Structures are given as structure tokens and as C-alpha cells.
Amino acid sequence: QRALDGLDIEGRLVIYSGNAPERYDAVRFEQFMRSPTLAVDGAYARLTPDTVAKYMMTSGSTGEPKAVINLHGMVASNARMIRSIWDEDRLDELTGGTQVMCNFLPWSHTYGAHSILHNMLDWGGTLYIDQGAPTPARLPEMLRNLKEVSTTQHTTVPAAWAALATELERDDQLAEVFFKRLVCMAYGGASMGQDIYERIQAVAVRITGERISLSAGYGATETAPTASNVHWPNDRMGLIGPPLPGNTFKMVPNAEKM
């Protein structure tokens, strides 16, 4: 109910499963699925891998923001590429077959809209939308949500990891809930300092007795988004990993960089 109250959905129809929401026009999911409509069937039948799924704006880090055409085939194949690097049997063993994430990354950016949303859809997991953020005003909400939801994966930006590291070090209750089911951590959007990594792992070892993989990768809005990934336990930040299955990289000299 709190999640719905935080959205501007007055006058919108809410489709629900479980407890009926308060104060909204709502229909149960089972009833919704039993209501036939040829329009939906027709629209679905016209979808192909080359059908445009969305126009995603770039962040402007390399110039003026521009609209990137993301096709259904792009976003679907990228989600499957990422899934292919997991040991699914081992993951199911660790998580009980249920993926859970609590995330604040906006769907107006490829990281949240693709790497988070589409991957959780592909897993058939549960995504809790976090109204918090790593800012002074919204950090308390982010921490409260992470105390309520014990996630199996946590992916966010370095600024959030920096804030979270401090709170994990001083709040044992938060640390216990955060690491209770966690099997994988990841960061993206910017580089992350080695010191932040070491602080997070120190808490992980104190709570669980072992380190938990904290990975990163390389991608862009145009690649929808992940092109490479570090998908093994690692102790060094700043790596991008090898290309995901189906991708090919070409290294091009650029001044003192590759």
C-alpha cells in the first residue's frame, strides 16, 4: 500500500494479486487474465525481435543526450546473455528459487530500465521499488526499505554503496537483514573505490563468514545495456570482465587509453 501511495496513479486502474489495495480502482489479476480481448492478442502477435520496445535517452556523458532505439530483440537477448553466465542450479540452491531485489535506480536510465527491470522480469523475480536514494533527504527511506526486504541481489551506483558501507558498519540489524539471503552484489554507472569494497566485504565476513561477489561490467544505452561483466568472485575494483556470450569487443587505441 505504501508503494502505491507514493505514486501518482489517481484515476488509474490497479491490477493486484493478494490483498486488494485501498482507495484505488482495482481488479484482481486472475479476473484480468480471464477477460479476453482481441486487441491484446493482435498486438502481441505483431511483435517481432525487430519491433521497437522503447526510445531510451542517453545520459549525456559523451555529448548531448540522444534517443536510442532499443528493440525487443535487443533487450530480450541482453537479459538472456546476463542470465547465461550464472550457475542457475547453484543460484536456486542459494536463494530457494526466488530472486528478490529492492532498487531505486530510475527507469529513465538504461541501468534501471534494462539491467534491473528486464533481468528481474526474465528471472521471474520480485522487484521492490525503493523510494529512497543516497541523498541526505532520502537515505533514511532507503535504509528502512533494506531493513524490511532481505534481497538476494543488490545492484546500485557507487554513491549508494559508499553510504551503505557506513550504515552497515554501524547498524548490526541492517547488516543482518542485508546479508541474510544475499548471493551477489554489483555496481555500475561510475567507478568505485577499492576502500568501499573492502569495508563492505569486512561486514559481509563478520555477518556471514565469507566474502560475497561484488561485480561490475561495461555497457551503454546502445547495448541495452550490458556488454561485458565480471561474473566471478573478485577482489579488485575497476574491472569490466570479458564480453558476454554473443558479444565481440574490438580494442581501439585512444590516446593513453584503450
Regions found by a protein language model. Give the residues of each.
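Conserved AMP-binding
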Residues: 83, 104-110, 117, 133
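ATP phosphate-binding P-loop of adenylate-forming
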Residues: 50-68, 79, 83-86, 218
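Conserved helix-loop functional segments at active or binding sites
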Residues: 34-38, 81-91, 170, 206
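Conserved pre-ATP/AMP-binding loop-to-beta segment of ANL
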Residues: 15, 33-57, 64, 89-100
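Active-site "substrate specificity/gating" loop of NAD(P)-dependent dehydrogenases
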Residues: 67, 75, 113
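Conserved adenylate-forming
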Residues: 4-24, 95-97, 116, 123, ...
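Structural detector for helix-capping/boundary residues
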Residues: 27-30, 50, 72-73, 105, ...
